[in-house]
Amino acid sequence: MAPADVPASLPLGLCLLLASGFGHAGKLLVVPMDGSHWFTMQMVVEKLLPKGHEVVVVVPEVSWQLGKPLNFTVKTYSVSHTQEDLNREFKFFIDSQWKTQQESGVLPLLTSPAQGFFELLFSHCRSLFKDKKLVEYLKQSSFDAVFLDPFDVCGLTVAKYFSLPSVVFSRGIFCHYLEEGSQCPSPPSYVPRPILKLTDTMTFKERVWNLLSYMGEHAFCPSFFKTATDIASEVLQTPVTMTDLFSPVSVWLLRTDFTLELPRPVMPNVIHIGGINCHQRKPVSKEFEAYVNASGEHGIVVFSLGSMVSEIPEKKAMEIAEALGRIPQTLLWRYTGTRPSNLAKNTILVKWLPQNDLLGHPKARAFITHSGSHGIYEGICNGVPMVMMPLFGDQMDNAKRMETRGAGVTLNVLEMTADDLENALKTVINNKSYKENIMRLSSLHKDRPIEPLDLAVFWVEYVMRHKGAPHLRPAAHDLTWYQYHSLDVIGFLLAIVLTVVFIVYKSCAYGCRKCFGGKGRVKKSHKSKTH
């Protein structure tokens, strides 16, 4: 028992402090994805550094965010394209989204202008393995694990090439590779396929469409990832599929949770860390505090379409500006395009804004978002109702989830008018049910035993300490498709049943012939004798 003048928590805290000092300091290889994907992945990496781990991040020389000064070792490799090529391909993809709204389902995405952008990303892996000096360095470094974003596939190839346990960090994976790689059951009867904008209560027609989409993914996704698998096969010197690359993953860290996601079965090595990006809110700067204070009793509306979309076609920008000018709130709009000529006095354009910090301010009334997972979770964490303008990818599903839960209104950004946006904003601001619903979601999301960032760090360290997590790997990985569905067992049992039925039938037929066939012949012979 602790002395009276010593706080009761001190001995426990001292023990934990001493125990942490004897923790395993490992060596982690990180293969990240550029853009907003890197923002939250970097949080995990930086949280690992004070624990004594050595972190090496491998990045291409050409990137948007990865080339910025970092607090850990960075190894770069040259690529065959320039920054202008990367910007051009991405701009081409983004511009196409402002011309035609992406149709529901993965298949339209596979045939969209995104193909050229992905081909550029996939080519990074060939460039990495052409750098023999870098490959030799990685080989000699004796890493404990690979921490990777699977979006460009290269991290999976790196893990397999060096035979290292891997931790995937992702929002999700379009196509069926998440289910096949993790072996999480995904019955199309109630688990909607990505980007279909469906819920788990589907009509018969929706279930038909969901199943067809599932079958279509198996037919067309391999061709979309052909460049990536060709490069992986070339590097590994053996033919591989996407499933071959995903199957060895030790732990899956998914940036979602069941506050947003629909309930579904998961495996023990699938860990949900939704809201990892909004764990810590800071006071807003003096500049933004001045904007907020000047808003008066009406408060502010935060408007951002994400870090990768900061310009909008002029006509659409003017429609948006007109709608924003009709509401009494102060609008803080992250926008770097041409200033709309009709911009109202209540709308302030900024090149960057502290989104999470502003949403956490008591005067935040609404959030206009493109429905990316980072923004959606910041809205949930801070309890701010949303007006959602999804453009592509998982944004469609995110918006549908929030709208279904009564926490926001979804608009078709290409077809909406100034009146539509005005009405949507007034609805989520003035209708109390939206605020109540988002606060309920916020309460559910925050009611957890451990912060998502700490949970992510724990599992990365876990894989490093134990050199993987094979005990969490389901045996389904080792079964063929017909064994997984017990078709061989069903066939065997069916064969037994049919054999028994056949034997019984033949026995009965034989018995009948013996019993009745013989009597018939006797009677017949008897009649012939009398004649």
Swiss-Prot record:
Write out the entry's keywords from A to Z: Endoplasmic reticulum, Glycoprotein, Glycosyltransferase, Lipid metabolism, Membrane, Signal, Transferase, Transmembrane, Transmembrane helix
Task: Provide the transmembrane region boundaries.
Answer: 487-503
What Pfam family is a match for this entry?
UDPGT
EC number from the UniProt entry: 2.4.1.17
The UniProt function text for this chain reads: UDP-glucuronosyltransferase (UGT) that catalyzes phase II biotransformation reactions in which lipophilic substrates are conjugated with glucuronic acid to increase the metabolite's water solubility, thereby facilitating excretion into either the urine or bile. Essential for the elimination and detoxification of drugs, xenobiotics and endogenous compounds. Catalyzes the glucuronidation of endogenous estrogen hormone epiestradiol. Involved in the glucuronidation of F2-isoprostane (5-epi-5-F2t-IsoP). Involved in the glucuronidation of the phytochemical ferulic acid at the carboxylic acid group.
* Database matches in PANTHER family: EG:EG0003.4 PROTEIN-RELATED, UDP GLUCURONOSYLTRANSFERASE FAMILY 1 MEMBER A1
Q: What is this protein called?
A: UDP-glucuronosyltransferase 1A7
Organism lineage string? Eukaryota, Metazoa, Chordata, Craniata, Vertebrata
Q: Corresponding gene?
A: Ugt1a7
